[in-house]
Amino acid sequence: MDGEALLQGLNDAQVRAVASPAASLRILAGAGSGKTRVLTRRIAHRAATGSLDPRHVLAVTFTRKAAGELTQRLRALGLRDTVAAGTFHAIAYTALRTRWHDRDIRPPTVLDRKVGFVARVLPASITRRGVSALDIVSEIEWAKARLVEPADYPDAARAANRRVAIDLPTVAEVFERYEAAKRQRRMVDFDDLLRLCRRDLTDDTEFAAAQRWRFRHFFVDEFQDVNPLQQSLLHAWLDDRHDVCVVGDPNQAIYAWNGADASYLHDFEREHPGAETVRLDRNYRSSPQILAVANCVLDRGAGGALVATRPDGPVPTVRSHADDRAEARAIARSIRDAHAPGSAWSDQAVLVRTHAQTALIEEALHDATIPFRARGSSGLLDRPEVRQAVRDLGGGRSYADTLADLAELTAAAGDTDRGANLGALLRLAHDYQSVDDRPSPAGFVAWLTDTTAEQPDAAGDAVELVTFHAAKGLEWPVVHLAGLEQGLVPISYARTREALAEERRLLYVAITRAQRALHLNWAQQRTFGERRMSREPSLHLEDIDETCARLRDPQGRRPPASPRKRRPTGPRSAPDDVLVALKAWRAGMARRAAVPAYVIFHDRTLEAVAAARPRTHDQLLALPGLGPVKVNRYGDELLDVVATHGG
């Protein structure tokens, strides 16, 4: 391999990242900035220049697919020796198996069906309350990722504002039962593999020496998603060494709810004195118009705004629909309209915030004979609580009993993802009843399977149906976002500043999956179980609407208020007095709604109101950051504040 040849075709920042002589390197790689290309070329460049031996490289990725892609790219670059690449769990398991073999230790059984195992240790009193094993498993996984023991779980969960369907001490009790049952059966789960590997690196000096001799140069991808358990294992591998390169993007940190801690990326230079940081901000994926929308979603001051390199494309669209069913049908029509001759169905994807949204969209795609594929476990029928509910149907009961049971399950699950999924199933149960004169549980199962089944050719060319989280790392020429409403984007249970910031980043991730065209949709009404609820557009859509209007007419300006409607001149308070009053009003509204102040209005919007001193709703609508939804909701109060404090 030629080191200089490996720098060809890279931009200046990428060259710095690939050729940096620093042993400790942090690469802040924005969406679509070519991070995998840079990571593989850095490994290959260091090998070509003699600063590392590929046989002693450990490259950690977050998926098996990413590990495979990294290995293939290194081979294509001419690297003769294969590097060790894999997920934390895969690498830890390989190391442990070697140790167990060398020490003649009988390996424990690795538990691969955690939900079923937890279900067997759940007290009957919990299952009667409609709490599923899946709810408990999520908390156990969060606790283990954060290095929290069962006894410490209640305090840790309270400190982290965890939303749990049952009381925290009961979760801790089930957590302890789960750990005891595993010990009794000599079983370990995937998180235990990391814990055991870290323990053995700390306690077994011979094992640690062998591991540290083998792994001398560390590369970690998606470092913003590392959790404390993974970070502690990385520390154990490194010991007192600092030959480590991490790649991450703070604007794509979307897994704090699952235990991830982006502070490891933020604090990398403090952890590794002398480390260098290179920022990659040139985006090679999305059109300038899509990036403008993505950048407007980020928090002001967050940094990391992306710079476009691709040609211009169409301005993203924002569409309102009467209800969620109309939204699903409109998305299906939009997909068919975008399916030009010679294009593939797989060039398009529908992204949703929650699994429960997929049912109506699957039905609409099915009715439109559009092949689709629910990636991973995105399909409603793949959700454990839905599978269990479907299995429980029948038993000679009437269909009315079936509906009643589903309604009871949905109500018991409350405002959770599980409740939303069961609510989607209940809605489908009512849909089935409207098409079958003699509905039965067995008939519903057959209809459900047919309605939500993948098309025959879905394994090949098919539209992808993916959640925002599952879409990370993927891209499509055309992306349709569904359900951009308050309560979904951001999700209803995101109430802290940190949770709302993560929801903002999640929308940013979803938007930056699009290469050429982006369509954003929301419904004015949405059905949850048996409840039909009015909806309001996501708080982010006002900024997006404003950005799209500017993109459509770069020279456009909102017309000033008509001179006939301007306030008469005369003595009045200084503008700051009005602004102070507006901010005080906003603070009170934010306290009552239990949200950060910027969710009500940005500072720049209040500054515009204070400067313009509007007297009518029309004058409010002429100001930046004020659309019809917010004027209808807050307009009268804004005008009262201005009238009271404006002199």
Where are these regions (language model features)?
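Helicase P-loop NTPase motor core of nucleic-acid translocases
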Residues: 1-33, 37-49, 148-155, 163-166, ...
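Conserved helicase NTPase motor core
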Residues: 3, 8-19, 23-28, 38, ...
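Conserved P-loop NTPase-based nucleic-acid remodeling module centered on helicase motor cores
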Residues: 54-139, 144-148, 152, 369, ...
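Conserved helicase C-terminal RecA-like lobe
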Residues: 164, 217, 344, 358-370, ...
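C-terminal accessory/binding modules appended to enzymatic or scaffolding proteins
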Residues: 568-615
